Design a protein with these regions (language model features):
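Ser/Thr/Gly/Pro-rich low-complexity, disordered linker/stalk segments of secreted
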Residues: 1-44
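Polycationic, low-complexity disordered segments in secreted or periplasmic proteins
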Residues: 18, 24, 44, 48, ...
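Intrinsic disorder/low-complexity signature
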Residues: 19, 27-32, 72-75, 102, ...
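Structural signature of tandem-repeat unit edges
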Residues: 20, 64, 74-96, 106-119, ...
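N-terminal segments that cap or nucleate solenoid repeat domains
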Residues: 35-90, 95-106
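Consensus positions within tandem repeat domains that build extended binding/scaffold surfaces
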Residues: 99-100, 121-124, 147-150
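A structural signal for leucine-rich repeat
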Residues: 126, 148-153, 172-177
Length: 187
């Protein structure tokens, strides 16, 4: 194995934000669809990695590989929490959003939550007063899996776009988790 770390172009990195590769693993099999923002690090549970200016924490490396979204680019106005991210040539499902992930982010206006997210942490979007558009692609959220005050303090005119069969259930969840009664939940 080569000792030279391989790097993929990922735009401008924040100082100290990128993880140093401990060992470079060659991608297994035919990973020809390598995304340009992938990260190459020694992967273990609890490891924090940065992919495309967003930070993740590895939650599972065996069976279904999974990560938790911990934070996005500091002053981003539009954030997409993807279905998967590529780390060391392997795909990891993004299954959760950390507590306080975007708390008090005044710049954030739009968030897209990927199809594999099944948990949103406490106060994840609390105080994001300019957050007006939330697209939820996942069908896996329940009241127990969305933390307290997850949507408290978002824009009172915010619109949630959710899967067709989840409009009624998600309307109850977002309002129970702090969103104003004036927010709209639609398909």
């Amino acid at each position: 194995p080569s000792t030279t770390p391989s790097a993929s172009p990922s735009g401008t990195a924040e100082p100290g934000a990128s993880s140093k590769p401990d060992a470079t693993k060659a991608p297994a099999g035919n990973d020809k669809d390598d995304n340009t923002g992938g990260s190459t690090v020694k992967v273990k549970v609890g490891k924090k990695v940065t992919v495309n200016s967003s930070k993740y924490k590895v939650t599972s490396v065996s069976g279904t590989r999974a990560v938790q979204f911990t934070s996005g680019k500091k002053n981003a106005k539009n954030v997409v929490i993807p279905a998967t991210v590529k780390i060391s040539g392997k795909n990891y499902k993004v299954t959760s959003i950390a507590n306080n992930a975007f708390k008090n982010n005044k710049k954030l206006k739009k968030v897209t939550i990927g199809v594999n997210v099944n948990k949103i942490g406490k106060a994840a979007f609390k105080g994001c007063k300019n957050l007006k558009s939330i697209i939820i692609k996942t069908k896996k959220l329940t009241a127990k899996k969305v933390g307290a005050n997850a949507f408290k303090g978002i824009n009172k005119k915010a619109t949630f776009k959710v899967p067709k069969k989840k409009v009624k259930a998600y309307k109850k969840i977002v309002k129970a988790k702090g969103a104003a009664k004036t927010v709209k939940v639609k398909k």
